A protein has these predicted regions:
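Alpha-helical transmembrane segments and their helix-start/interface "positive-inside/aromatic belt" motifs
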Residues: 1-15, 90-97
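Alpha-helical transmembrane segments of multi-pass membrane proteins
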Residues: 15-36
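Interfacial segments of alpha-helical transmembrane regions
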Residues: 85-104, 171
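Membrane-interface interhelical connector segments
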Residues: 116-139
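Transmembrane alpha-helix/helix-exit interface in multi-pass inner-membrane proteins
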Residues: 101-123
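Interfacial helix-start motif at the membrane-water boundary
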Residues: 47-68
Length: 199
C-alpha cells in the first residue's frame, strides 16, 4: 500500500472511530461522572466512572487512543507527501510533519496519565491516583492542540496551493480556515477562563 493510500484510509476511518469511542461509547457505556464538579471531586468522579467497568474502560480508551494516533499519523503522512523544494507551501508542510508527531507524543502522554491513575486506584493508592488523574484532566489542553491545529491548517493550506483540482483546493482552504478558527477558539477559551475554574 502506498503512503498516499494509507494516509487517505487513516484520515477517513480514524476520526470516525475516535469520535464514536470518546463521544458516544464512553459516555453511554461508562459514564462521565456528575456534571459541574471541579478539582479533586472531578478527578475522583472520573476515576470512579471508569473503574466501575475497568476492563471495558481499558478497551474503549485503547481503541479510541489508537484511532487518535492513526489520525495523527495520517496527517503526518499527508504533510510528508506534499513536501518538495519546488512545491508551493513546502515550508508549511515541513513544519507540520515535525509538529504533528510532537503533538501526538504529548497526547499519548496525557492519555497515559489516565491509565496510570487507574492502576494506582486499583492498587488502593487513592492519593496518587487522584493526583495523576488531576494532571490528566488538564494536561494537553492548550499547547498540544495549538500544534495540532497549526499542523492541520498548514497541511490544508499547502494542499490547496499545490492542487489544481477545484474540489481538493476548496477542501484544503476550508480545512485551513477551520483550523484557524479552532485555534483561536481554544486559545480564547483558556485565556478567558475564570481563575476559579482552574482549581
Amino acid at each position: 500500500m502506498s503512503s498516499k493510500n494509507l494516509a487517505g484510509y487513516l484520515l477517513a476511518i480514524s476520526p470516525i472511530v475516535m469520535i464514536v469511542m470518546f463521544a458516544a461509547v464512553f459516555p453511554a457505556v461508562l459514564g462521565t461522572g456528575e456534571e459541574g464538579l471541579k478539582g479533586e471531586a472531578l478527578a475522583k468522579a472520573s476515576i470512579e466512572a471508569g473503574m466501575e467497568h475497568v476492563h471495558l474502560t481499558y478497551v474503549v480508551a485503547t481503541i479510541g487512543g489508537l484511532a487518535m494516533m492513526g489520525m495523527f499519523l495520517g496527517y503526518t503522512l499527508w504533510a510528508r507527501l506534499l513536501q518538495g523544494d519546488d512545491k508551493k507551501g513546502n515550508a508549511l508542510v515541513v513544519v507540520a510533519s515535525i509538529a504533528m508527531p510532537v503533538a501526538a507524543a504529548g497526547m499519548m502522554m496525557s492519555m497515559d496519565f489516565n491509565f496510570a491513575a487507574a492502576r494506582a486506584w486499583i492498587k488502593g493508592d487513592e492519593v496518587n491516583a487522584l493526583t495523576i488523574q488531576a494532571v490528566a484532566e488538564y494536561a494537553g489542553n492548550n499547547f498540544i492542540w495549538t500544534f495540532i491545529f497549526l499542523s492541520v491548517g498548514f497541511t490544508g493550506l499547502a494542499s490547496a496551493l499545490q492542487t489544481t483540482d477545484k474540489i481538493s483546493k476548496t477542501v484544503g482552504y476550508i480545512l485551513a480556515i477551520i483550523s484557524v478558527i479552532m485555534l483561536i477558539t481554544v486559545s480564547y477559551t483558556h485565556l478567558t477562563l475564570p481563575t476559579s475554574d482552574l482549581v
